[in-house]
């Protein structure tokens, strides 16, 4: 696999070649994913739940993400690595740039921030400093207490229009990628069609430019609640490498996610 860059992802969108992404937190899984077709790894603050056992992602620190980013980068020099910026690490442009720099030094190719138009100045500042940005709209887990739980967003037209407006604002500020989480598939298509930057969906149907899953959901080892949008590929294939290959193949072909995994 040749080195994946922002230009690679833009070309994939233009050619309608679906982007495959998974979360990872260590070198072994990064290498496994690299060897079996994954193009993007997210070092997600989801580690607060799947690794640290928390009820949400709010306890994750910038140092946690930096540590796991270094581990992931050690497993692959070619994969495109996105590092999540944890809760309250991007409350001002200055804080955002300082904390993002730590993640870039740890080996990230891009940082991800949750939120809409209010992030404009911070994203602009990051872009001016040469730090690529991924936005995140829809169900943004760091706002779980505002939403009253992990709930589908954007079903009401007013909400949908706000998400579309936020997406356009993030792109205008300089964001080069956008994650759409737990929104109706029809809305995900509207957002994807409205942007020139690639979109990556999780619980957003199969009309986005790519897909991402939490690796624990991919192999069916999630504790407790199993999201509607997840699929246990290990159950279907019997071993980890084949599970990853099957995920990538199904994303590329459009077989995953299917109608049973999307929200209306």
From Swiss-Prot:
InterPro entries in the record: Pantoate_hydroxy_MeTrfase (IPR003700), Pyrv/PenolPyrv_kinase-like_dom (IPR015813), Pyrv_kinase-like_dom_sf (IPR040442)
UniProt-annotated binding residues for Mg(2+): 45, 84, 114
Protein name: 3-methyl-2-oxobutanoate hydroxymethyltransferase
MF-aspect GO terms: 3-methyl-2-oxobutanoate hydroxymethyltransferase activity; magnesium ion binding
Entry function: Catalyzes the reversible reaction in which hydroxymethyl group from 5,10-methylenetetrahydrofolate is transferred onto alpha-ketoisovalerate to form ketopantoate.
Lineage: Bacteria, Pseudomonadati, Pseudomonadota, Gammaproteobacteria, Alteromonadales
GO-annotated biological processes: pantothenate biosynthetic process
Organism the protein comes from: Pseudoalteromonas translucida (strain TAC 125)
Pathway connected to this protein: Cofactor biosynthesis; (R)-pantothenate biosynthesis; (R)-pantoate from 3-methyl-2-oxobutanoate: step 1/2
Reactions performed catalytically: 3-methyl-2-oxobutanoate + (6R)-5,10-methylene-5,6,7,8-tetrahydrofolate + H2O = 2-dehydropantoate + (6S)-5,6,7,8-tetrahydrofolate
EC number: 2.1.2.11
Subcellular location: Cytoplasm
């Amino acid at each position: 696999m040749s080195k994946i860059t922002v230009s690679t992802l833009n070309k994939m969108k233009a050619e309608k070649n679906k982007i495959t992404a998974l979360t990872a937190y260590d070198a072994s899984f990064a290498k496994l994913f690299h060897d079996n077709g994954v193009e993007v790894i997210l070092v997600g603050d989801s580690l607060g739940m799947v690794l640290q056992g928390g009820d949400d992602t709010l306890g994750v620190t910038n140092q946690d993400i930096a540590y796991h980013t270094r581990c992931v980068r050690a497993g692959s020099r070619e994969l495109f690595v996105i590092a999540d910026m944890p809760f309250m690490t991007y409350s001002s442009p200055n804080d955002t740039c300082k904390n993002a720099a730590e993640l870039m030094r740890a080996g990230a190719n891009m940082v991800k921030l949750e939120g809409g138009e209010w992030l404009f100045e911070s994203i602009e500042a990051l872009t001016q400093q040469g730090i690529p940005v991924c936005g995140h709209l829809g169900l943004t887990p760091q706002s779980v207490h505002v939403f009253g739980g992990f709930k589908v967003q954007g079903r009401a037209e007013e909400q949908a229009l706000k998400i579309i407006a936020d997406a356009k604002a993030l792109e205008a500020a300089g964001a080069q990628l956008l994650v759409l989480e737990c929104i109706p598939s029809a809305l995900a298509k509207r957002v994807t069609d409205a942007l020139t930057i690639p979109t990556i969906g999780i619980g957003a149907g199969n009309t986005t430019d790519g897909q991402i899953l939490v690796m624990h959901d991919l192999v069916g080892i999630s504790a407790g609640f199993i999201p509607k949008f997840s699929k246990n590929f290990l159950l279907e294939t019997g071993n980890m490498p084949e599970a990853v290959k099957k995920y990538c193949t199904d994303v590329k072909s459009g077989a995953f996610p299917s109608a049973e995994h999307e929200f209306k």
